[in-house]
């Protein structure tokens, strides 16, 4: 596949795991939104109109290579087909409700999805530009250190609302090309939500990201991050091959049970076994997974816990990203000191692990890891009950 640059809370037990249902929120119009269709579906739609497959490919190229949303701009499409498309289809990406720019070049967009918002973040670096994309409105997993989780869960995003974030960002960044703004080179499913709880919408969206007539990214440049929905991770390996990152954040089950509650259902051993099964199928990961580990002061950052983490990961080929925790109002944690992060990192490197301390980006606009919140109508009964009862969060220190 050729690669191009992009220029132009439901309780855990109630959340869908292996049987992911496509989001069925009614669109605003009866026209088919072509952003909801991957290439196979586009060809089927065009066949129903009596058109050949290459016509679908032509339209996809205009949609994603040039970020066009007006059929009249597609000059190699005959007028009859353009008129037909105007009657039955549309290209409708989510709109930007608000934009914030960080001093470090990071851009955060609040993206309108129906009557709510999700957040999408553009992160430029010297050799790449990464787009962080949301998969759900809110999140069901209730990770205690994450701002999104505190909002509760509302709904899954449609394919058009996921790929539409990439489309909208690529269009904006394309308009800034003259200013030297770097085109998007990587996409990470690390925004709001747990991607594996929305597989039937996330997978087609990632398929479009990697399609030559879509955004044309290589599978090594599209990364899905998960907190450990084991049945869905096994299913993912049969559906698509992308780079994988795992939100581990603890070396032992007792700590992870508290800060990543899904661990009570799928513990670390089960999670890492599923990761190894995925790596056995995948060519996108170079044989190893990225382990994400947020550093919480005196919670999971002792040298003893670094040794425990090394032991825990000894059978799982990986590189480790240590992530300074990014605070949000009301959070019961503190960020690990540089000295504690340093000691933790050195222990892991002594065991031979490639270990990187992630540089915090966009924290002045609340765009850093764990700070995305959007605007969510909280429909999670359990979360609401906790808020009403003022239930404290139990924390262990080390």
From Swiss-Prot:
Disulfide bonds join 132-369. GO terms for cellular component: cytoplasm. Pfam families: Radical_SAM, RlmN_N. Its EC number is 2.1.1.192. It is found in: Cytoplasm. Residues 125-364 form the Radical SAM core domain. Gene3D superfamilies: 1.10.150.530, Aldolase class I. The active site is at 119 (proton acceptor), 369 (s-methylcysteine intermediate). CDD domains: Radical_SAM. [4Fe-4S] cluster binds at residues 139, 143, 146. One of its GO terms (molecular function) is 4 iron, 4 sulfur cluster binding. Its main location: cytoplasm. Keywords: 4Fe-4S, Cytoplasm, Disulfide bond, Iron, Iron-sulfur, Metal-binding, Methyltransferase, rRNA processing, S-adenosyl-L-methionine, Transferase, tRNA processing. PROSITE patterns: RADICAL_SAM (PS51918). Belongs to the radical SAM superfamily. RlmN family. This is Dual-specificity RNA methyltransferase RlmN. The lineage of its organism: Bacteria, Pseudomonadati, Pseudomonadota, Gammaproteobacteria, Enterobacterales. The gene is rlmN.
């Amino acid at each position: 596949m050729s690669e191009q640059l992009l220029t132009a809370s439901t309780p855990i037990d109630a959340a869908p795991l292996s049987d992911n249902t496509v989001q069925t929120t009614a669109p605003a119009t009866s026209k088919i939104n072509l952003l909801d269709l991957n290439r196979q579906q586009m060809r089927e739609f065009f066949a129903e109109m009596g058109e050949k497959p290459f016509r679908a490919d032509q339209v996809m190229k205009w949609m994603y290579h040039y970020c066009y949303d007006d059929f009249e701009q597609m000059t190699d499409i005959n007028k009859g087909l353009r008129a037909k498309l105007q009657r039955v289809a549309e290209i409708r990406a989510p709109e930007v409700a608000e934009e914030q720019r960080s001093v470090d070049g990071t851009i955060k967009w609040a993206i309108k999805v129906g009557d709510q918002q999700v957040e999408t973040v553009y992160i430029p670096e010297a050799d790449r530009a990464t787009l962080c994309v949301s998969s759900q409105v809110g999140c069901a997993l209730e990770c205690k250190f994450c701002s999104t989780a505190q909002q509760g869960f509302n709904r899954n995003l449609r394919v058009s609302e996921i790929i539409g974030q990439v489309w909208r960002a690529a269009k904006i960044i394309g308009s800034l090309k003259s200013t030297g703004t770097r085109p998007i080179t990587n996409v990470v499913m690390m925004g709001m939500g747990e991607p594996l709880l929305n597989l039937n919408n996330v997978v087609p969206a990632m398929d479009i990201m990697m399609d030559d007539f879509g955004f044309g990214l290589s599978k090594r440049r599209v990364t899905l991050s998960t907190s450990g929905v084991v049945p869905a991770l096994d299913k993912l390996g049969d559906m698509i091959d992308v780079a994988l990152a795992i939100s581990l954040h603890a070396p032992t089950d007792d700590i992870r049970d508290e800060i990543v509650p899904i661990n009570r259902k799928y513990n670390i051993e089960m999670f890492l076994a599923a990761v190894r099964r995925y790596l056995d199928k995948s060519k996108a990961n170079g044989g190893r997974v990225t382990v994400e580990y947020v550093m919480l002061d005196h919670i999971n950052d002792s040298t003893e816990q670094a040794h425990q983490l090394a032991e825990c990961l000894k059978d799982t080929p990986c590189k480790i990203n240590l992530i300074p925790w990014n605070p949000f109002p009301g959070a019961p944690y503190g960020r690990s000191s540089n000295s504690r992060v340093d000691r933790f990192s050195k222990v892991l490197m002594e065991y031979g692990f490639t270990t990187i301390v992630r540089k915090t980006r966009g924290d002045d606009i609340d765009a850093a890891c764990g700070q995305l919140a959007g605007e969510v109508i909280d429909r999670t009964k359990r979360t609401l009950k906790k808020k009403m009862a003022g239930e404290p969060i139990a924390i262990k220190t080390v």
